[in-house]
A protein has these predicted regions:
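Active-site cores that bind ATP or allylic diphosphates and position pyrophosphate for catalysis
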Residues: 22-214
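Receiver (REC) domain switch/active-site residues of two-component response regulators
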Residues: 17
Length: 214
């Protein structure tokens, strides 16, 4: 919603020492490519010792087993995933169903059904594939879950924050954002400057869909 320079400024104001950019081709790609691209860039700095990420599942053993299983999927699992995709399932759902049908441990299947855990598993896979010595540090995802639309307590999901910003309701975000971020957003809204939202692209997307051939 906000340009990369403003987001980088917020990160630095919040205590980050370095902000790195992930190319759009990777940031808009699958969790696997997103994770591998991110870890590859971090490895390139030569100073990566720990990789911290949020996850609904925090048992390291489960995430490591899931990373191993998804790195060496059998032909049967791959074929089932292909069939599921042809039925219109999303890739995460297709893989979840394929693993469940193959008798994979239920705790691994559960971890792969949670969005943040799935990305964490891909980070662990990427660390292994790139031969990194960095140690994964798992942080428990609590209170506001992925895509939660509620603004309550002291935590809010990114989805809920984006919705509030799109509704130009900055005041409701005061307790959920760092002071610098809140003041910048409030200042923009007071000047009538709205950040880019999905509604700004709806006509373009609709045109593209209607122009597609069968």
């Amino acid at each position: 919603m906000f340009d990369k320079r403003m987001r980088a400024k917020w990160a630095l104001k919040g205590g980050a020492d370095l902000v790195l950019q992930l190319p759009s081709a990777l940031s808009l790609s699958s969790a696997e490519r997103f994770a591998k691209g991110s870890v590859g860039i971090l490895e390139g700095t030569g100073v990566l010792n720990y990789l911290s990420f949020g996850s609904e599942v925090t048992e390291a053993d489960i995430l490591h087993r899931a990373a191993h299983i998804t790195s060496f999927e059998t032909e049967k699992i791959k074929e089932t995933i292909k069939t599921q995709l042809e039925l219109g399932r999303s890739f995460p759902r297709a893989r979840h169903n394929a693993l469940a049908e193959s008798g994979i441990q239920s705790d691994v299947v559960h971890a792969l059904s949670r969005p943040n855990s799935t990305l964490g598993i891909e980070y662990i896979k990427a660390l292994k594939q790139l031969g990194s010595k960095a140690e994964p540090v798992i942080i428990k995802r609590m209170h506001a879950m992925h895509d939660s639309s509620e603004l309550k307590g002291s935590f809010a999901s990114a989805s809920a924050i984006r919705r509030a910003v799109e509704c130009e309701d900055a005041e409701t975000l005061k307790s959920f954002l760092p002071e610098q971020v809140f003041s910048d957003i409030a200042a923009m809204q007071s000047l009538g400057q709205s950040p880019a939202g999905h509604k700004d692209f709806s006509k373009i997307i609709l045109y593209a869909v209607r122009s597609m051939s069968e």
